[in-house]
A protein has these predicted regions:
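Extreme N-terminal leader/targeting segments of oxidoreductases
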Residues: 1-57, 75
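Conserved flavin/dinucleotide-binding core of flavoenzymes
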Residues: 23-44, 314, 320, 364, ...
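Active-site rim elements
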Residues: 118-129, 273-281, 353-361, 418-430, ...
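Mid-domain catalytic core of redox enzymes
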Residues: 301-413, 443
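Active-site/ligand-binding neighborhood in enzyme catalytic cores
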Residues: 155, 162-163, 187-304, 311-314, ...
Length: 518
């Protein structure tokens, strides 16, 4: 990153000492399997070496779950094949650059971004939580360098048409005033002895001291504004008159609008959203590319699965490639096909598995991106982070890469609410652009004149995906169906995250290992 602004970069080296293949869970409780035992939370290093010798596995789908499974299984001696319906590996791990084509069921778009390695759009996963240890471990092992991803930025905006006259509010002012008002309210209750039953005398003094700092209260425990909110005129960059604080918003105004009571207020405190967040330098597909390079010889592209059959303690897959149907037989199958697609493939699944597959719900999440002069940096001092609105576009993301450069890719919409995302998905690409321009202009008045070259991805319309990530809670699908094991982010505790796909792959490998050593 050539720029004059310091940004931390975590470079994942090639050392195998900290790679996923050598990490163990010392607290895991073993499960007795005769001559073989496995921890409840299985991971590489827990499976017996060469345990797959003479056994074969067919994996349906070359996404992260499929490629993780293949990478680890072949190290155990299994003969592994991956059947991928599309012409690329990675599944929903995709990065769109100049010239790339997005094909949906009823439309096609070509990306018109300038040819520049810094100008890219991650329409699927776009961030990595710092505690997603296995994904980060693979990045280290595969030499995929990571950089900081700014998830929360107090210089970004909060907007509701029904709050503060529809004027976007700089996040730092809202957070400061919420903390200050609530702290003052609680301090007043303590000083009026309203909490005597809950607090000792020492507790009261200590809590009051904490509240004074937490809410930036004065010596009378009143809130009359804070420098944390910035200064009038130029909230994000200071002003010529540093003595003029921004007018305090009273508590009733702050809580009167349902949007200002909602998800954004604790977004960055969510377990998977807490700082530090990370992203691969150059695009999320760097991870998919690294995996692909290690299992490339195992993948058959353009292999559309037509049937999944059980045959005398083995599995037969019938797939079609270039109009020709082929049978592929294996001892075991790991199926990572999204249930939205899987439900329409003829199969021999148990009735319980079929029922859960047919009722499994996916998010209709969608994203849209524009290329633009970095007006958010140059004019508003917003460097990365997310602005929120209760319009359909929901979020605007500012890029965390190439800070200080002239142009960047701004995410003009990230929509996952069911009604809004469905409506967005039903629009034509141009209609989506038009809507995003109008709504984005309500946050940044220069928006329509600055952004261009819009491109969108509605995951419910993407062939062989038909959804963004799983929403339902799996039960039966967590169990093998004879020699068929299901995997994918939708079957993990971390739905919608690459780490979840990896954990699900580990579970699938563990199930196969238990069968082999039964």
């Amino acid at each position: 990153m050539a720029m004059g602004i310091g940004v931390g970069v975590s470079s994942c080296g090639s050392s195998s000492a900290d790679s996923p293949t050598t990490q163990m869970n010392s607290n895991a409780q073993p499960i007795s399997l005769g001559s073989y035992s496995s921890p409840k939370s299985a991971r590489p290093g827990d499976w017996p070496a060469n345990s797959g010798a003479g056994k074969s596995v067919v994996i349906l789908g070359a996404g992260i779950a499929g490629m993780t499974s293949a990478f680890e299984l072949q190290k155990l001696g299994y003969s592994v094949s991956i059947l991928e319906a599309t012409n690329r590996a990675g599944g929903r791990i995709r990065t769109i650059r100049s010239g790339d084509v997005v094909n949906e069921l009823t439309s096609s778009q070509t990306c018109n971004f300038d040819v520049n390695g810094e100008l890219y759009f991650n329409p699927g996963p776009a961030r990595i939580a710092h505690h997603h240890e296995f994904l980060i471990g693979y990045c280290r092992e595969f030499n995929v360098p990571l950089e900081n991803f700014t998830n929360d930025n107090r210089a970004a905006l909060l907007h509701s048409p029904s709050a503060f006259g529809g004027t976007p509010q700089v996040a730092k002012t809202v957070f400061s005033d919420i903390r200050g008002n609530i702290s003052s309210l609680l301090a007043s209750a303590i000083n009026q002895n309203a909490l005597d039953q809950a607090l000792t005398t020492n507790d009261k003094a200590n809590v009051l001291s904490m509240l004074r700092n937490y809410g930036d209260l004065d010596n009378n425990y009143s809130y009359s504004g804070s420098s944390r909110a910035g200064f009038s005129g130029q909230e994000n960059v200071g002003s010529r008159d540093r003595d003029t604080q921004i007018t305090v918003k009273n508590l009733s105004d702050l809580v009167s609008d349902t949007f200002l009571q909602s998800r954004w207020i604790n977004f960055s405190e969510g377990y998977n959203q807490q700082s530090s967040m990370l992203q691969p330098i150059g695009g999320m597909d760097k991870i998919a590319t690294a995996f692909r390079g290690r299992v490339a010889s195992n993948i058959t592209y353009g292999a559309v699965v037509k049937e999944i059959r059980k045959v005398s303690n083995s599995i037969r897959i019938i797939y079609e490639k270039n109009g020709i149907q082929t049978e592929h037989n294996a001892d075991y199958c790991i199926c990572t096909i999204p249930t939205t697609v899987l439900k329409d493939i003829p199969n021999d699944f148990s009735e319980a598995h079929k029922t859960e597959i047919s009722s499994f719900v996916y998010s209709n999440a969608a994203k849209l991106a524009f290329q633009s002069r970095r007006f958010w940096e140059q004019d508003h001092s917003i460097f990365g982070g997310i602005s929120w609105t209760n319009q359909d576009i929901t979020q605007i993301w500012y890029p965390s890469n190439a800070l200080g450069h002239n142009d960047g890719i701004i995410i003009g919409a990230y929509i996952w609410g069911n009604t809004a995302s469905t409506n967005f998905s039903n629009q034509s690409p141009q209609q989506r652009i038009n809507s995003a321009l109008l709504q984005g202009n309500n946050l940044h008045s220069e928006y329509q004149s600055e952004v261009s070259k819009g491109i969108s991805v509605a995951w419910r319309n993407i062939p062989f995906q038909l959804g963004a990530y799983g929403l339902s809670t799996a039960n039966t699908l967590l169990t093998p169906d004879d020699n068929i094991i299901f995997a994918g982010e939708h079957l993990s505790i971390l739905k919608g995250w690459q780490e979840g796909a990896i954990l699900s792959a580990y579970n699938a490998i563990n199930e196969i290992t238990k069968k082999v050593h039964a």
